[in-house]
Amino acid sequence: MRWPLWRVAVAERSMEPALHPGDWLLVRRTIVPGRPPRLRAGQVVVARHPGRPGMLIVKRAARLDAGGWWLASDNPAAGAVDSRAFGAVPASLIEGRVLLRYWPLRRG
């Protein structure tokens, strides 16, 4: 059994100013066998990179297309790869929805 809640560390600057490298996120799994993920446009998600399945990415779910979710970086100037490079991401690759950033407690 996989836990419904898990944690992920942000590794890149692609989601600044909302999230920064070193931030820790609490994530709720969206994959329930037999059910599509319950997501809305604007939510931050953790997904498997379509071209590198062992790599997790943190992106904003921009819209749902016929091929899956269009995932976008908040900071495209950081050079991060998102759906502009790899297209829509199938729902099966969306691992979870970010509930909150729990570390650091405050930014100074």
What are these regions (language model features)?
Residues 1-108:
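Extended hydrophobic leader/signal-anchor segments used for secretion and membrane insertion
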